[in-house]
């Protein structure tokens, strides 16, 4: 069965749904459980016209994200092996994490709304990641 499960979260309230699903599967399989959050690369969003210290902004975001991942991990009764914080292209960061940490199941969420039909990051991941995926529907109200 699975040996290492990675749960991709966006740090919204729905992240706990995904984490609980991952913890339940990990417990049944006796697998390691890890979390990952991917931030966009801020330097790609700004042009040279804006004078801003991107490294200090990025450092602050990384620190806040790490704290949020730690807090999320405390909300379940299963140990979280790794709390990963990536930056850049969502699909590429997940591919690299899957390879580096020997992940054999990736859990992501998918919003079933109008915009997700056109711009789904999960669909791109499905086309690139070479391990099993569990895509959990997140129903928008």
From Swiss-Prot:
It is found in: Cytoplasm. Keywords: Cytoplasm. CDD domains: USP-A-like. One of its GO terms (cellular component) is cytoplasm. Pfam families: Usp. The keyword DNA damage does not apply. Its main location: cytoplasm. Gene3D superfamilies: HUPs. It comes from the Bacteria. PANTHER family: STRESS RESPONSE PROTEIN NHAX (PTHR46268), UNIVERSAL STRESS PROTEIN A-RELATED (PTHR46268:SF23). Belongs to the universal stress protein A family. Required for resistance to DNA-damaging agents. Homodimer. This is Universal stress protein A homolog. It comes from Haemophilus ducreyi (strain 35000HP / ATCC 700724). The gene is uspA.
């Amino acid at each position: 069965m699975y040996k290492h499960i990675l749960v991709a979260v966006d740090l919204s309230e729905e992240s706990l749904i995904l984490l609980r699903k991952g913890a339940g599967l990990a417990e049944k399989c006796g697998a390691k459980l890890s979390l990952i959050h991917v931030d966009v690369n801020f330097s790609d969003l700004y042009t040279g016209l804006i004078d801003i210290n991107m490294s200090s902004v990025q450092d602050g975001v990384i620190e806040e994200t790490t704290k949020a991942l730690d807090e999320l991990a405390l909300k379940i009764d299963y140990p979280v092996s790794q709390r990963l914080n990536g930056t850049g292209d969502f699909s590429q960061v997940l591919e690299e994490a899957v390879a580096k940490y020997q992940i054999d199941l990736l859990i992501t969420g998918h919003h079933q709304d109008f915009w997700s039909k056109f711009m789904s990051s999960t669909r791109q991941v499905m086309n690139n990641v070479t391990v099993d995926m569990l895509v959990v529907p997140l129903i928008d109200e």
